[in-house]
Design a protein with these regions (language model features):
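Small-residue-rich transmembrane alpha-helices
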Residues: 43, 81, 116-184, 224, ...
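Intracellular coupling helices
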Residues: 78-120, 181-192, 476-517, 572-583
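Alpha-helical transmembrane segments of integral membrane proteins
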Residues: 47-55, 83-110, 114, 134-253, ...
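C-terminal transmembrane helical bundles of large multi-pass transporters
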Residues: 390, 429, 433-526, 537-541, ...
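Residue-level signature of transmembrane alpha-helical entry/exit and packing/kink sites
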Residues: 62-66, 107, 112, 152, ...
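Hydrophobic alpha-helical transmembrane segments of multi-pass inner-membrane transport and secretion
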Residues: 58-93, 170, 198-223, 456-491, ...
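Mid-to-C-terminal secondary-structure elements
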Residues: 1-63, 136, 218, 222, ...
Length: 585
């Protein structure tokens, strides 16, 4: 089912969707003429923003975004737990004294959990404020140029509140149990007691590193995917091309009037300053299709399930191939001699030539379908992308618009400068021929391609932003842990330095410990990234989900940032004064 016009309406007060749909159905019935096989009508739907293909892409994007946000939430929770665990270690003596004075373990745990939840609620308030502030900017990342309600509503606030409470409570549970279960005598006498806190802390740091590597690797993959989509050889030139669409039939032009209008329009556009070439075409890449099928001639290779040959069509003017930058492999383009009533000629692409006449020269051959008398092939054009990125090689036949008039016209203008700057001038030039001329849409070919690749750009930007945030959280957690351990081990470091340990050896031990955690996390993250390949493969374009360069680059980035984050605590450890450290202890 196809459509040529979409109308968006707002219901009047007191009018239900069912009432409006019934009225529109009556109007639809009045527009149908079954006696002549006319099936035009009105389709009423609430799904008014996006086409089905766009809805599917946005659904995939939404699922990916939910997964990415969930990973960031887990990293943030682990980071929060690490900080609380370090804080709980420093409060062990306080909790032990309170326990000695009669405070029950359950009461201590409740207090610590309450503190965790309050911190989580404070973070929730900051996050909600940022969400309101950045909602407009986030909406601009959506593809297809539609504005969707992005401002948080009460449902979003409720979910954020619940997640904050639950996450902060879960993250604070282990630190609370650790602090409330400290050895009373040892803590009061300042003796260091062996606990499992360090193991839990290390596990949390490793998990952050692993999850952040998954996101960083994903960011690299999506960035490469977007680059591949934007730099793919489409078989035509998109830069410096301006497109103006006009539907002459909907504006009351007869075929004779339309034929008379086009030459003058092309002349006016050619004479504009900054215009290099001008042509017309019925179809523009990525903007719908016009097709037919035919019975395969002897020796042909059918390309459809019903045994026929499916052919994409386009009616173009002379200079179309030069204007769009489509290379002619052999033969010629259309010229002024290809007139109405003359020998019907066509240019086929390489794929169609191979299907119709495998291994033979297509020039001079004839293509016939329906009631047409046949088209003589005068040229072969290079294959191009017509309908979707990554499509299988598609058949295409070009006919001369002078011989096969089409009222739907796309003026293709090659410009010397920025094409968008020429748009108002070109529209004004055409309105000198018809003051009431309406344009279906006006866009640069670069904009058309950008819309097609928007899903890959959005994926790259979002995963890149969240990957960077995840890496920042993980590295901050590692920095906090290393700094905490250096501070806790000040006496040990001082004693070792007093016994002759060099500063380089001390710094090396600190760096080895932190990089060991980072390397373990990176290894686990690589395993996770490989395991998730079947979920990410469908979202990538011409990039393998296990691309080794992406995984190596993500791992190197993680280790480099981890080393940088550990450098300051390691340097601080080398500046410990042995005498002062022992005296303070």
């Amino acid at each position: 089912r196809s459509s040529w016009l979409r109308v968006v309406g707002r219901l009047a007060p007191g009018t239900t969707y069912q009432m409006a749909a019934a009225d529109l159905q009556s109007l639809s019935d009045a527009l149908t003429y079954p006696e002549r096989g006319d099936t035009e009508g009105i389709l009423v739907t609430r799904d008014l923003l996006y086409r089905p293909s766009q809805t599917a892409q946005l659904t995939s994007l939404s699922k990916m975004l939910v997964a990415v946000v969930t990973i960031v939430l887990v990293i943030a929770a682990a980071n929060f737990a690490v900080l609380l665990l370090s804080r709980a270690t420093t409060r062990t003596r306080e909790m032990s004294i309170r326990a000695a004075m009669g405070a029950g373990r359950a009461r201590l745990i409740r207090q610590l959990l309450a503190e965790s939840v309050l911190l989580g609620l404070a973070g929730c308030a900051v996050g909600v404020g940022l969400a309101y502030t950045l909602s407009d900017a986030a909406a601009t990342l959506l593809p297809y140029g539609f504005a969707t309600g992005f401002a948080p509503d009460l449902r979003v606030l409720a979910v954020a509140l619940v997640l904050s409470v639950v996450t902060s409570a879960v993250a604070g549970l282990v630190p609370s149990l650790h602090a409330a279960g400290a050895n009373v005598a040892g803590a009061i006498s300042h003796r260091r007691t062996a606990t499992g806190g360090s193991l839990v802390r290390d596990a949390l740091v490793v998990s952050q590193m692993a999850l952040s590597l998954v996101l960083v690797a994903g960011a690299v993959l999506f960035a490469r995917s977007f680059w591949a989509a934007r730099t793919q050889d489409l078989g035509f030139r998109a830069d410096h091309r301006l497109i103006l669409q006009v539907d002459l039939r909907s504006q009351g032009y007869t075929e004779a009037e339309g034929r008379a209008f086009l030459p003058g329009a092309l002349t006016r556009l050619r004479n504009l300053p900054g215009v290099s070439r001008v042509a017309t075409s019925r179809q523009i890449p990525f903007q719908g299709d016009w097709s037919t099928d035919l019975e395969p001639p002897p020796g042909a290779l059918p390309n459809s399930e019903d045994g026929k040959i499916w052919i994409g069509l386009n009616a173009v003017s002379a200079e179309y191939f030069e204007t769009m930058g489509v290379e002619l492999v052999s033969g010629r383009s259309f010229d002024s001699g290809d007139i109405e009533g003359g020998t019907q000629v066509a240019v086929v692409n390489q794929r169609l030539a191979h299907i119709l006449w495998p291994g033979e020269d297509p020039l001079g051959r004839s293509v016939s379908f329906g009631e047409d008398l046949g088209f003589q092939v005068v040229g072969v054009a290079r294959d191009a992308t017509y309908y979707a990125l990554g499509e299988d090689p598609t058949t295409q036949m070009y006919v001369s618009v002078q011989q096969r008039y089409q009222p739907l016209v796309h003026f293709v203008i090659e410009t010397a400068g920025p094409p968008a700057d020429l748009a108002p001038v070109a529209q004004a030039a055409l309105r000198q021929l018809d003051a009431e001329l309406a344009f279906g849409w006006v866009a640069t070919m670069d904009d058309v391609v950008a819309d097609v690749t928007a899903r890959y750009k959005v994926s790259a930007v979002l995963v890149g932003l969240f990957g960077g945030l995840a890496l920042l959280l993980a590295v901050a957690g590692l920095y906090g842990v290393v700094s905490f351990l250096v501070a806790r081990r000040t006496r040990d470091i001082g004693v070792r330095m007093a016994l002759g340990a060099g500063r380089g050896r001390v710094a090396g031990e600190v760096l080895r410990g932190s990089l060991g955690l980072a390397a373990t996390g990176a290894a686990l993250g690589l395993v996770g990234a490989v395991m998730l390949r079947r979920f990410t493969a469908s979202l990538l374009y011409q990039v393998e989900a296990t691309d080794p360069w992406a995984l190596i680059g993500a791992s190197a980035t993680l280790l480099a940032v981890a080393a940088a984050a550990s450098f300051v605590p390691a340097l601080r450890a080398t500046r410990v004064d042995p005498v002062e450290a022992i005296r303070t202890e």
